Amino acid sequence: MDIHEYQAKELLARHGVHVPRGGLAYSPEQATYRAREIGGGKWVLKAQVHSGARGKAGGIKLCANDEEISSAAEAMLGRKLVTQQTGPRGKLISRLYLEEAVDIAQELYVGFVLDRKEERVMIVASAAGGMEIEDIVEKEPNSILRTSVDPGVGMQRFQAREIAFGLGLDHNLIGKATETIFSCYQVFRDYDASMLEINPLVVTRDGNLIALDAKMSFDENALFRRPEISELRDKSQEDPRETFASDRGLSYVGLDGNIGCIINGAGLAMATMDMIKIAGGEPANFLDIGGGASPERVAKSFRAVLGDKNVETILVNIFAGINRCDWVAEGVIKAIREVGVNVPLVVRLSGTKAEEGRRILADSGEAVIVADTLAEAAEKAVAAWRAAAKKKAA
């Protein structure tokens, strides 16, 4: 689960990390009012969306007076911000954050992520932060500092101090940097975060360290013990397809293709998507119906997939162990008759009760394309999609 920049900064500020003074705004009038509250002569207006690279996409504006603030707010609110991280759909800007401009002397980068392979927290830092950090990582990988933290003992202050020295900071900033890095780790740990990124962490001309931007993601499996974090969720920033599926207990990830996928098991789902691409198609989603799939659960899956208007074909691929193919087949027929499946449908059933499942499909009289193997299922799905697209274009 992601949260907004201003929410992440509130969490950081509670732990002693310095952030610019700022305020939330939902209208141009509120934005100009916030400027008067904050004071000063320059402000930065930021679109609050769950994405990085906002500056390059026009989501961050430096303003010097009320007119510039109002104009920038008017241009941002209500439109979708498209960045390299949002995909072509973009994300709606419904709130803005106005904060005081900061006189920057140097931009740094500090990030905290889970290294799942090593089962440790990895701290990544660079003396060159800002909008070009991705290019720096690619072109100058040796300039990136990496420190791993043993979860058994947690981060030690000497590690934070080593990072501060590694960033090449002036000696009078080492103490401040050590405390800032250590406090960021505490926020990461105490709220069950999966990612915390400060980019940039700036050195100001008067010798302070300020978190100028902040991104945080959280482990959804830990939200039951973090109700204060759950309350920060903004569903308007999430893929509505994923929200619909999540509310119904389905594991769903939206993609940008045209072939909807209903599959059991993450491994089979990924293999199926690979086969669809090899056959020349593009998957519209990842949907794992899980074990014990009842007819009702299968029907819910169809509703989730068909909620994406880009879906022009559906592929159901089931390898039943815990599941039963006859139950899945009943769910497919239930979905066709109750949900209304108006796109080509390819079904491959294998494993427990597979013969019974195929018989149910055959006896139903519904237009279901049956496949025996994974490769055949992917090829038939792509062929059906192409035929449907050709018919639609005619």
Curated annotation (Swiss-Prot):
Organism this protein belongs to: Mesorhizobium japonicum (strain LMG 29417 / CECT 9101 / MAFF 303099) (Mesorhizobium loti (strain MAFF 303099))
Subunit structure: Heterotetramer of two alpha and two beta subunits.
Catalytic activity: (S)-malate + ATP + CoA = (S)-malyl-CoA + ADP + phosphate
CC cofactor note: Binds 1 Mg(2+) ion per subunit.
EC number(s) recorded for this UniProt protein: 6.2.1.9
Record: residues binding ATP: 46, 99, 102, 107
Name of the protein: Probable malate--CoA ligase subunit beta
GO CC entries: cytosol; succinate-CoA ligase complex
Keywords, ordered alphabetically: ATP-binding, Ligase, Magnesium, Metal-binding, Nucleotide-binding, Tricarboxylic acid cycle
Positions annotated to bind Mg(2+): 199, 213
GO MF, one example: malate-CoA ligase activity
Lineage top rank: taxon: Bacteria
Lineage: Bacteria, Pseudomonadati, Pseudomonadota, Alphaproteobacteria, Hyphomicrobiales
Gene3D superfamilies according to UniProt: ATP-grasp fold, A domain, ATP-grasp fold, B domain, Succinyl-CoA synthetase domains
